[in-house]
């Protein structure tokens, strides 16, 4: 399956924004086929996969950055897999939305 270049470019930009807005290594944000970052300060995780993980598709990430209020709905529907006590990234996406729209 070939990646949509437009989605790939958007995912790259979104991951960069999230990493800049919320640096750290408490949560791993995974977008299979596109990339993954570690973000959110506060934990003392140092090696391997953090105990808090969030995974979604590229198109779901693009949808979420445009409508961060959909976080709960997307998690409930299974389009976002979020595990761990620090895995709620909805505040990060709310903050990132304005920066994303400015680009």
Functional labels for PLM-detected ranges:
Residues 1-103:
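Feature captures hydrophobic
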């Amino acid at each position: 399956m070939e990646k949509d270049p437009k989605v790939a470019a958007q995912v790259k930009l979104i991951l960069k924004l999230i990493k800049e807005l919320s640096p750290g290594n408490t949560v791993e944000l995974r977008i299979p086929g596109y990339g993954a970052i570690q973000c959110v300060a506060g934990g003392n995780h140092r090696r391997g996969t953090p105990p808090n993980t969030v995974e979604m598709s590229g198109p779901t990430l693009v949808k979420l950055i445009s409508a961060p209020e959909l976080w709960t709905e997307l998690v409930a529907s299974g389009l976002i897999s979020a595990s761990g006590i620090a895995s709620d990234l909805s505040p990060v996406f709310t903050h990132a939305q304005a920066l994303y729209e400015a680009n």
